Amino acid sequence: DFKDWMKTAGEWLKKKGPGILKAAMAAAT
């Protein structure tokens, strides 16, 4: 289920830290 996957991804990002999220945002812009 996609929602479950998004929840898992969200938890993973929290554990890995905001650095990965910032990198993803930078790559998207």
From Swiss-Prot:
It comes from the Eukaryota. One of its GO terms (biological process) is defense response to bacterium. It holds the Pfam family Ponericin. Expressed by the venom gland. One of its GO terms (cellular component) is extracellular region. Keywords: Antibiotic, Antimicrobial, Fungicide, Secreted. It is found in: Secreted. Has activity against some Gram-positive bacteria and S.cerevisiae. Has a non-hemolytic activity. Belongs to the ponericin-G family. This is M-poneritoxin-Ng3d. It comes from Neoponera goeldii (Ponerine ant).
